[in-house]
Amino acid sequence: MSLPQRPGKASPRREDPYSSFRESSRRRHRTHESAHHNDSSAESPSGHRHHRHHRSRSSRRREDVDEERGEVGAGSRHKKTLSKPERSRVDQSHPHYHYRQKSQNMPTQPSTTGDEPLMGAEGEAETNSSQSMDYKGKDRVYVTEGNINQPLERLPNRRRIKKRRSSRKITRRAAAAERKRQEALEQVRAPSPWTTYCAIITFWAPDFILKCFGMPKKAQRSAWREKIGLISLILLVGAFVGFLTFGFTATVCGTPPTRLRINEVSSNYMIFHGKAYDLSHSTHPAAAGIPAGSNVLWDLPHKYGGQDGSFFFQEVNGACKNLITLADGSDVPTNSAGDLAWYFPCHAFNQDGSSKPNKTVDYYLGWACHTSGTARKTFYNLKSAGDVYFTWDDTKNTSRNLAVYDGDVLDLDLLEWFNASQVNWPSKFDELRENSKVRGVDLTYYLQTGQEKRIGQCLSQIIKVGSIDTDTVGCIASKVVLYVSLIFILSIVVVKFIFALLFQWFISARYAAPRTSMDSDSKTRNQQIEDWANDIYRPGPRMTDHSVVERGTKRASFLPTTSRFSSPYTVSNGGKQKYQYVTMASQNSTTRLVPGAINSMYKQSHNSSGGSIGPDGSRHNVAASRSSLALPGQDSRYSTAMLESEAPGMGGYVHEGVIPQPPPEWQPYGFPLAHSLCLVTCYSEGEEGIRTTLDSIAMTDYPNSHKTILVICDGMIKGKGEEFSTPDIVLRMMKDPIIPKDEVQSFSYVAVATGSKRHNMAKVYAGFYDYGEDSIIPEERQQRVPMMVIVKSGTPAEANKSKPGNRGKRDSQIILMSFLQKVMFDERMTELEYEMFNGLWQVTGISPDFYEVILMVDADTKVFPDSLTHMIAAMVKDPEVMGLCGETKIANKKDSWVTMIQVFEYFISHHQAKAFESVFGGVTCLPGCFSMYRIKAPKGGQNYWVPILASPDVVEHYSENVVDTLHKKNLLLLGEDRYLSTLMLRTFPKRKQIFVPQAVCKTQVPDKFMVLLSQRRRWINSTVHNLMELVLVRDLCGTFCFSMQFCIFIELIGTLVLPAAIAFTFYVVINSIVHKPVQVIPLVLLALILGLPGVLIVVTAHKFVYVLWMLIYLLSLPVWNFVLPTYSYWKFDDFSWGDTRQTSEGKDKGHEAGEGEFDSSKITMKRWRDFEKDRRLRMQMSGWGQAPGPGGYPTYQDPYGGH
């Protein structure tokens, strides 16, 4: 991106490639709006600034930065350097590209380095929402600066209609032109390497054949080819692992020859020159003292079996020529060339070296020396049975005089067999024989040059008795690879185990709430959780009251306790710096959310309806309900208009039963309270499941003044076997609506879909949770919890079609995420989002920008009473935590064998995998059934907040509607929950995603194998593709092998080779049983991998029953590691939800591409401010209004008696 500009610097030139995005066409078209917005933003005050500065402060900070960096002159530029992340080029692959694009249209620019935001150049501040206000002169409807209550002018109806029609025509033309441009690009765009590979690997299946097999669409054929390409890669990885496991040693080491250890050669063999020969079936021709056909091993008077007969076939006249010469008067035959017939007397000796020199002559001179050509040829044709080897310990035997040369073992005592009357030998031979220091030593280095080398070679030819026990280079390499792999795998297994224990014992307690309404004894609480988790419909245990206001002693100090170097996140406490938790409410502690003194209601239980308002609302009047209107720290973008007037059902009206906000210092659980949204996404769930889910959320011990239930129904769906549709079921669980349910209208919004389905409509219902007449929760324990229901009803065009309004769970999440982004950035919003804004205001009395965290729960999940408190405590205690999850327990453990095999799998995935990842703050999968995300986080100076879940980069990528590749479909259609976790880590790799074991929920898992098969198909495929995304993120914790990126890579490879791994495991076990010797190392490794989780159970679970669940899991390993992955890989191109979610119309076939064209002119988008002005205009025309008080604001009435 372009570098931050100094005051007075000229605008970047068009030819500057680093400034291209600043001069985009979108920005040039809005140039005339920049100055206009700058004026208004400069005049509007801001209480708690999310990411906004005052002009004067920004200018001062910018000048300070220049001075600190030693740069002189307004026109100086920073030099580009690789050491500054904020100076890197920001293109669409940058993790904060969209955030930069959004924030450049605001008065400040963001920082990704931890510094406070830096101001951009003058004239850079503008807003996306200004496009809806492109009016000039006298006919302009609204003004963007000043008081919004000033008289308003309207355009004539004819002009407005004409302008609207013109806008629709322009939109249609632009869409058609864009579609044609995309089609042209598709035709000329070169295929990617991956597409080319898939086409090559599937050349044998042309398109016309695939069409015959039920793939008429190009997208289907493309997905099938990509599937085959992925399967081929999986097979290659599996083959590589198999080769490394079994084939590498055989390839580089080969089949080792048969080797016989010295002193263990049996009497069936004779040894010649260090090799053993099997002579048990041999016969000897007739010779002196040897009858014809006799066996030399047993038939002769002297038994030669097991002896060394090297002197029978001596190697002469080779390297020893001219070293060993004929003595004077010798009887050894020789020729004219000086060749000798033998060197030693031709006698055998014992293999253990115990024979004494024998210089006698039997029968005749040269008897048994085998000097004839026939004898030599017969010997050379013999095949040796194997080498005779010595270990290094054998060479150090004190009873023998052994040395080693070039791998050959030499018996120096055999030099005593020389007959001085027959031959002469070098004196070096005697020196070596008499030197005790050479015993058991390798003489190769000592005898390596010149004459000494000849001596060593000569000795190897005449006194070699065997070979040293050594491996080839290939065998050594294979052993190195084996042991390195063993150490590597063991290190991963052991480190994961140890770190999981460390997290359980020491780290996890830091994130938990100091106290909750549950029993403080951990054993008692664990037992309560286990009992509660055994039945899906069992309510949580009774809660105790811990609503004690936390106040610190505030003594005035004569000396200053802070300085300009003090952190805004710490407060002085007796000379020590104590960390101060930061929330939206705590930052406004000097001006409370609810004006007035602390009332006695805060001393009562916050979850008791009697302390705040009765179930019928009788204890609250209108004045009290408006107590939350005066939000001194609230952003002026919203607060000004809200305080102006209160038309029933619109933005200014607050429900009479709204729950008063406690003062910020009220900390019932030892940490500042943060406002939370509890998102429950529904599809086809039944009444009983939804009821228990909402009951569990409503009955959590977290104060109901700081939690709001938000239910989103994904279409007009009726579950299988249900009497009512899911929206009707949910609406029957809401009471005291702001607007009567039959009067609620549908509003448009931009859905996550393609074609005409991109336009969708939804209804917004706001009220309070209704426990029902037959509730199992006693009335005195029922809390009054704000509730909002969004029903995606669909457009009129799809009213008669199947599942109107259904766009998927991701679309439901995007409705909320996009809304929060637009609230935080003050962007244009749809009519649906405006109604959501008003609905939240009306039932809570606070602005939606006060919400900091979102709890995401599926409609079939039940939450333990203190789980929400523990999760929010972790968020408040550590601002770096951007996401977390709790433990999911199985409620139907004993329903069938299918549920039984899942119990331990759930346990180990949390307490080992997620616990290990939490140590580094990089949990790769936050399950969508029970997780929490941070909407925004404090950063930098006081009152500075940066978007996290509401970040444009997260929202933009998560709302991707063009899903045209196999990879994208597996990410966005099957595993959207896991992809959201991936997006968060990819966008904010330095922040944390953790596991909070104190937060617990329960759910029902599939009890039929086909349902489990369908569920795991989606999970495994999405896991593979999400790991492919995460393995490319290089900024995660750690470096090289000691990093989360490396752990993710290992996990990806491990997931891909699961079928091959279980096959190899069975092979090793069976091979160890059948063949000897037993392969010890693989068995030890297997025992450690499977046994350590059992130790983890004993240490962390404290219940023996989980050991039994582990044994059941081990018996089902073929299902987990072979059946499920193999089925999933073959179904890579199946994007339906299968048997997991069934409706009255049958199985869910997924969300296919929408037909037709998207007409954006049907969706009205304005800033909240503009919507509110429209409402006021309608109020003025209807003649309704409230008499303003002093200063133009309505008269404020203190609910606590103050004035």
Swiss-Prot record:
Disruption phenotype: Leads to elevated spore production. One of its GO terms (biological process) is ascospore wall assembly. It is found in: Cell membrane. Glycans are attached at residues 38, 128, 358, 397, 419, 588, 607, 800, 1021. One of its GO terms (molecular function) is chitin synthase activity. It is an enzyme of class 2 (transferase). Residues 102-114 have a biased composition (Polar residues). The chain crosses the membrane at residues 228-248, 487-507, 1046-1066, 1080-1100, 1104-1124. It is a multi-pass membrane protein. Signal peptide: none annotated. Residues 47-60, 157-172 have a biased composition (Basic residues). Residues 83-94 have a biased composition (Basic and acidic residues). It holds the Pfam family CHS4. It catalyses: [(1->4)-N-acetyl-beta-D-glucosaminyl](n) + UDP-N-acetyl-alpha-D-glucosamine = [(1->4)-N-acetyl-beta-D-glucosaminyl](n+1) + UDP + H(+). Polymerizes chitin, a structural polymer of the cell wall and septum, by transferring the sugar moiety of UDP-GlcNAc to the non-reducing end of the growing chitin polymer. Plays an important role in septal growth or maintenance. Mediates colony spore formation. ChsE and chsD seem to play a functionally redundant role in lateral cell wall chitin synthesis. Belongs to the chitin synthase family. Class IV subfamily. This is Chitin synthase D. It comes from Aspergillus niger (strain ATCC MYA-4892 / CBS 513.88 / FGSC A1513).
